[in-house]
Each structure stands twice: as structure tokens, then as C-alpha cells.
Amino acid sequence: MYRVGIGFDAHPLEANKKGLYLGGVKVSEEYSSIGHSDGDALIHAIVDAILGATNAGNIGIWFPENEENRGRRSTEFLEIIRKKILAGKYEILNIDSVIIIDKVRMNPHIENIRLKLARILGISKGNINVKPKSGNTLYGNSVSVYAVCMLKKVGT
């Protein structure tokens, strides 16, 4: 049986030296996203896509805005979802994503992001696609991400 899920996340950006993380990779020294955790909108969208495909709720249920998750690295969220939701139950066939951001040029970071996500999820980077878009100035000081995943239930 095949399952498909879609995820979305968006965060405002602010100019500072904390750095912006997308897909677990620092993509900017000049900006950071405003969020409860580290604000990694790409990982948040992927987590929601996986949770949607498995009918397992959403990122807010699994990782609520509480003290335990304040400033937490989103890579940890993805690792937990891999272990608790995917392991032995589902195989990731494909993840496709679109990052819409005007302030940061993403093309130089795409391969590192694909490698990082592949390593966390235990899959080939060939199963992960990341498409950056500028948004043609419509999105200003923000980052928005859409992600879709296709899973195959193990043993079917």
C-alpha cells in the first residue's frame, strides 16, 4: 500500500547572527527564522508530510510549543519520527519540497541539504528533491516550505 502526505510550514525572518537552518543545514549567517524551536521550516514541512501520510497527526501534536521544545533542533524531530513512525513500518519512496525564500540564495546549499536529510532518514539522496524559489519578492521577510512524501507500507 502506498501513502502520500503533504506538509507546509512558514516562518518570518529576522536579521541577526544566529543563522538560518533549512534541512538541518545552516544556509545564512545574516538571517534566522522566528520560531519556537530552531525554525527549520523545511524539516517541519517534511515531518508534517510524513505524519500526514501515516495518519499520525501533525508536528504540533508530536512536538508542542513547550519548554522541552524551545530552541530544539528540528533534526531531532525528524529522527524521532523516523524511529517511532517509519522504522520497520514504512519505506520512504520520495520526498519533494519547495522552499520559497527571497532573502537567501538556496542553490549553493541544495546538495548539502539533500545529503543531510538522507542521512537522518536513512535513505538515498536520490529519493529527496529540494526546489528553491525566490517568490519574486512576494514573500519578503519570510520562508515558506511545501513538502510531499510518498511512502510504501512495508510488507504489502
Swiss-Prot record:
Reactions performed catalytically: 4-CDP-2-C-methyl-D-erythritol 2-phosphate = 2-C-methyl-D-erythritol 2,4-cyclic diphosphate + CMP
Cofactor remark from the record: Binds 1 divalent metal cation per subunit.
GO molecular function, one term: 2-C-methyl-D-erythritol 2,4-cyclodiphosphate synthase activity
E.C. number: 4.6.1.12
Cofactor (UniProt): a divalent metal cation
Residues annotated to bind 4-CDP-2-C-methyl-D-erythritol 2-phosphate: D9, A10, H11, H36, S37, N58, I59, G60
Gene3D superfamilies recorded: 2-C-methyl-D-erythritol 2,4-cyclodiphosphate synthase
Pathway of action: Isoprenoid biosynthesis; isopentenyl diphosphate biosynthesis via DXP pathway; isopentenyl diphosphate from 1-deoxy-D-xylulose 5-phosphate: step 4/6
Superkingdom classification of source: Bacteria
Binding site for a divalent metal cation: D9, H11, H44
GO biological process, one term: isopentenyl diphosphate biosynthetic process, methylerythritol 4-phosphate pathway
SUPFAM superfamilies per UniProt: IpsF-like (SSF69765)
UniProt KW Lyase keyword: yes
Family: Belongs to the IspF family.
Subunit structure comment from the entry: Homotrimer.
Record's function text: Involved in the biosynthesis of isopentenyl diphosphate (IPP) and dimethylallyl diphosphate (DMAPP), two major building blocks of isoprenoid compounds. Catalyzes the conversion of 4-diphosphocytidyl-2-C-methyl-D-erythritol 2-phosphate (CDP-ME2P) to 2-C-methyl-D-erythritol 2,4-cyclodiphosphate (ME-CPP) with a corresponding release of cytidine 5-monophosphate (CMP).
Identification of the protein by name: 2-C-methyl-D-erythritol 2,4-cyclodiphosphate synthase
The gene coding this protein: ispF
